[in-house]
């Protein structure tokens, strides 16, 4: 039986922060911290003197004063976090999160009894709902908010969604602590414990409820957009009857589904939760860096859930253009764009695992790709034992395939063509497959004519009337080599040139790098061949 009790940081409770006979504006700190005898104490007279000296130009740069200033900063941070933890123990994470979001109280000030009362009153109001928080006359710092009453439901809409700078670090700390507490609990979950303990997990301080509450903190900090987008992708993954974001609530579709689900269905649900928990460790790592002084990430690779052949440190996957299945599952594939228009789907060779191949096939089926272009040579496939998933008949999870060779040709780079029939449930789709058997890694094709011929073959693969270009990630060619950066980028750029020979190849490369990663079109010899193809096309156009 799993336990979800959170271990307290120490023995301090809310009552520990109330000190009779002490001025309400005296700075508080934790004495004998990290021991069983820790207690909240008022600042000593000697400390006050050093703090006063730190305000005087003559003394503020002395070693003893500077050391004291740093100690005070650390003390202030520790007691604030301990106080917020005590508040969370009493009122719950949601109330504390909401209070920090709505309140404009300066969290960078030293903790005093006056500040303790102000923050506690905000949390009490938040515990009773946003309306109480706004109506509370003792709440001295509520951001501009508008009440919207619709159909009997009262909601609060923020006129200013940005939180104050002083509230950002506490919100990030809450998210970090929540993740560090809940991830191990999610990793221990199994199908039986999920069925038996779901109500406990999805209420109070249970791991599912706490996780969803803590992750909301990131949505309140504009600078944390990359982190928030990452967790939003994970929360949108379908598990059982609903998206993962709904698994932190009792009494809904998720709970009803769990009651009726088979042992196999629960096992599959837990498997997805485990891979999501593993991905959330990446968020934890980023939050740890921010806590240590790093800036907010400006870019982040999207979650791969174990489906990617290469680590994102080697082959990044831009999460803003990452392709997602209908059930919200992200796949390690990007939509390449040029001049704002989609050109192709691009990825690495699928990882040789059942889950990765099933996701890859579902993507081809759901996106109704105009064709599949495999640029890994026959020699490379054998040397690296890459899956020849596009020829023969296979079953990958829910997807069944049956591929028939249509033609072989030495012209245009030894292209084999297949028609691959895909089926998943009632959905059926047949996709043309072009396998280029003699394109060496990190090198150009044997001739520029072969590159142009291949581009023509791809453009002419127009399955079921699907257009070669689209305004979305549907009906596009899916292209991959081994890593999905060199040959794949070259092939996609050749398609752009066939559309418009006057296209700026440097801009094509820049747009592809923005679309997927900075390694796109990284091989100089392949880029030289693209320029030769462009010159050839321009001469033909001129004549």
From Swiss-Prot:
Catalytic residues identified in the record: 481 (phosphocysteine intermediate)
Note: Requires SicP as a chaperone for its stability and secretion.
UniProt protein name: Secreted effector protein SptP
Top EC class for this record: hydrolase
Site (described: Arginine finger): 209
Source lineage: Bacteria, Pseudomonadati, Pseudomonadota, Gammaproteobacteria, Enterobacterales
Entries under CDD domains matching the protein: PTP_YopH-like, ToxGAP
Keywords, sorted A to Z: GTPase activation, Host cytoplasm, Hydrolase, Protein phosphatase, Secreted, Virulence
């Amino acid at each position: 039986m799993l336990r979800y009790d959170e271990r307290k940081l120490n023995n301090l409770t809310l009552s520990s922060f109330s000190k009779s006979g002490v001025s309400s504006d005296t700075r508080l700190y934790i004495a004998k911290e990290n021991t069983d005898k820790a207690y909240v104490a008022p600042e000593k007279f000697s400390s006050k003197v050093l703090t006063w000296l730190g305000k005087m130009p003559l003394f503020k740069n002395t070693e003893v004063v500077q050391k004291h200033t740093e100690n005070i900063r650390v003390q202030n941070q520790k007691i604030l976090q301990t106080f917020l933890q005590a508040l969370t123990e009493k009122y719950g994470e949601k109330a504390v999160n909401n209070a920090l979001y709505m309140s404009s109280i300066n969290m960078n000030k030293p903790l005093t009894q006056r500040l303790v009362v102000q923050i506690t009153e905000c949390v009490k109001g938040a515990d009773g709902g946003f309306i109480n928080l706004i109506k509370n006359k003792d709440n001295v710092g509520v951001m501009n908010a508008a009440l919207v009453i619709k159909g009997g439901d009262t909601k609060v809409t923020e006129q200013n969604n940005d939180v104050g700078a002083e509230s950002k670090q506490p919100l990030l700390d809450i998210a970090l602590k929540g993740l560090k507490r809940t991830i191990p609990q999610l990793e221990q979950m199994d199908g039986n414990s999920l069925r038996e303990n779901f109500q406990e997990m999805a209420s109070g301080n249970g791991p599912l409820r706490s996780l969803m509450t803590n992750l909301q903190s990131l949505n309140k900090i504009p600078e944390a957009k990359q982190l928030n987008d990452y967790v939003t992708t994970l929360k949108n993954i379908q598990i059982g009857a609903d998206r993962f974001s709904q698994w932190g609530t009792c009494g809904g579709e998720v709970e009803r589904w769990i009651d009726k689900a088979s042992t196999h269905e629960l096992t599959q649900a837990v498997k997805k939760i485990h891979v999501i928990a593993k991905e959330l460790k990446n968020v934890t790592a980023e939050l740890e860096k921010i806590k240590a002084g790093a800036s907010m990430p400006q870019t982040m690779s999207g979650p791969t859930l174990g489906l990617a052949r290469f680590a994102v440190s080697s082959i990044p996957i831009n999460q803003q253009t990452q392709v997602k299945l209908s059930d919200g599952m992200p796949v390690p594939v990007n939509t390449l764009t040029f001049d704002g228009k989609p050109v192709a789907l691009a990825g690495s060779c699928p990882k040789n695992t059942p889950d990765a191949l099933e996701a890859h096939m579902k993507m081809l089926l759901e996106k109704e790709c105009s064709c599949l272009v495999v640029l890994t040579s026959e020699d490379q496939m054998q040397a690296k034992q890459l899956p020849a998933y596009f020829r023969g008949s296979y079953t990958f999870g829910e997807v069944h395939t049956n591929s028939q060779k249509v033609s072989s040709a030495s012209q245009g780079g030894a292209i084999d063509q297949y028609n691959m029939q895909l089926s998943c449930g009632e959905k059926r789709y047949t996709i043309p497959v072009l396998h280029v058997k003699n394109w060496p890694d990190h090198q150009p094709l044997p001739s520029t004519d072969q590159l142009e011929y291949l581009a023509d073959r791809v453009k002419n693969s127009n399955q079921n009337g699907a257009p070669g270009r689209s305004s979305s990630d549907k009906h596009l060619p899916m292209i991959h080599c081994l890593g999905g950066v060199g040959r794949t980028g070259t092939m996609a750029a050749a398609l752009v040139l066939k559309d418009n020979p006057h296209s700026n190849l440097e801009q094509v490369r820049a747009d592809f790098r923005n679309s997927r990663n900075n390694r796109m079109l990284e091989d100089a010899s392949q880029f030289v061949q693209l320029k030769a193809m462009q010159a050839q096309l321009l001469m033909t156009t001129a004549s």
